[in-house]
Every structure is written in structure tokens, then in C-alpha cells.
Amino acid sequence: MNILYSILINLALFLLGYLLLGSFNTSIILSRRVKNDDIREHNSKNAGATNSLRTYGAKFALIVFATDVLKTLLPILIISAIVNHVPAVNAFSYASYISPQALGLGVVIGHIFPAYYKFKGGKGAACTVGLIISINIILFLIAFLIFLLVVGISKIVSLGSITVAFSLLLFVWMPWMIQGPTGYWTNAVEYTNSFTTLVNYWYVSPIIYTLCAFLVLVSHRDNFKRLINKSERKFAIKKAV
């Protein structure tokens, strides 16, 4: 029964993330509300921060990026806090089987395949950043440095995103990275008593990240083709319109 309840609870979190958070695509909503436009009709036709940067400028893109990161990170932290600090939930016998990052997976998938926009959304990179921070802040710092290095040299944002998605797979599967002190947010079981049962399931977060990384890489398939053909666009900022 533990396995069944665990699956049902985490499936509910996944659907919550997919339908109520991920499927509300930030760049589509803002482009329609603020610009009376649709971001998906411009440049790469992608509903994400990079295309927002090219189409509407840095300020618009920063808002999109920050919102996409936070719409993944904050709900994960809220679920974690509820499970750990609300007595009624904490006393629930299956609370220790809840993986808050199941919600994050739903957000990433919803962002890429939004239910309310004909399943045509972004590439999931910014939302995955929120997931990364929730797993371990050190992973985010590693990702940030790799991204800066790659984009600084190549001037190609997509190459930076692709490299980060691949590179973090080397780190996220280290058990100490998941449940060590710097994994405090949702994984450090010595600090989050409700998740002590998950100590034997440390690989849950790496599996969730691996799924997200795979989706991010698949969503960059056209970028792969342009990189191979050496026709990928380099970094450029459009003035706000």
C-alpha cells in the first residue's frame, strides 16, 4: 500500500504542477497582455526567455525568466514546508513518501507542452533551473558557471543550455549532492525529518532531473541541427519595443 499511496500522492503533485502552473506559459501570457502579440509568431517561435530577449528586449525577458524559475522553485519549497511544518500533514502516515519535486516535473512538462496553448510552449530551461535550485543550490552555481563560460565563448545561448543539461547529469547522480547539507531545501534528510523515509530513495530527485534534462534536450532538437550546420544565431539583445 505504501507504494500505491506514494504513486497517487506524487501523481497528484505532478498534475498540480502541470495543469495549474506549467501550462500557464509566462511569455505567452505577457506577450498577449502587455504587447498585444504572440511571442510564438516571432524569431524562433519559441515561448521562452531567449526568444523574449530577441523579440521584446532584456527587461521583458528577465521578467519571463525569473517568473519561470520561481513558478517551479516556490511551489516545491511550499510543499516541502507544508509537509515538514504543518502538524496535520506531518502526522499523515504517507507524508514521508511525498517528493515535492514531482510537482516540479509537472511544471517543466507543462511549460514545454502547455495544455492551454495547443501543447506549444517553451523549451523548459528556466523552469528546470528552478528544479535544480530546489535539489541543491550548489548544482545551480555549477550550472550558472558552465552557462556563462559556454555562452561567453560561443555567444550562443542554446549551446549554453544544452551543455548545462548534459553536464549536470554528472553531478546530480552523486548521493552526497542530493542528501548532503547543501541539499537542504527538500533533500537533506538530517534537517527535514518528514523525508527520512526517502534516505533509501535518494535517486528520486536525480531521476526527476534526468527526465527534465531529456525533455529540455529534445526541445532543443532544431538547435542541434543549426549547431551542426553552423547556422545557429548568436547572442543579441533587441531594444525594448
Curated annotation (Swiss-Prot):
Coiled coil spans: none
Annotated function: Catalyzes the transfer of an acyl group from acyl-phosphate (acyl-PO(4)) to glycerol-3-phosphate (G3P) to form lysophosphatidic acid (LPA). This enzyme utilizes acyl-phosphate as fatty acyl donor, but not acyl-CoA or acyl-ACP.
Transmembrane segments: 3-23, 63-83, 97-117, 131-151, 156-176, 198-218
InterPro entries recorded: G3P_acylTferase_PlsY
GO molecular function ontology, one term from the record: acyl-phosphate glycerol-3-phosphate acyltransferase activity
UniProt entry keywords in alphabetical sequence: Cell membrane, Lipid biosynthesis, Lipid metabolism, Membrane, Phospholipid biosynthesis, Phospholipid metabolism, Transferase, Transmembrane, Transmembrane helix
Membrane disposition: Multi-pass membrane protein
Protein known as: Glycerol-3-phosphate acyltransferase
Biological process annotations from GO: phospholipid biosynthetic process
Catalysed reactions listed for this entry: an acyl phosphate + sn-glycerol 3-phosphate = a 1-acyl-sn-glycero-3-phosphate + phosphate
Pathway annotation: Lipid metabolism; phospholipid metabolism
EC numbers, comma separated: 2.3.1.275
Protein family (similarity comment): Belongs to the PlsY family.
GO CC terms of this entry: plasma membrane
Self-association and partners: Probably interacts with PlsX.
Top-rank taxon, per record: Bacteria
EC category: transferase
Main location: membrane
Subcellular location: Cell membrane
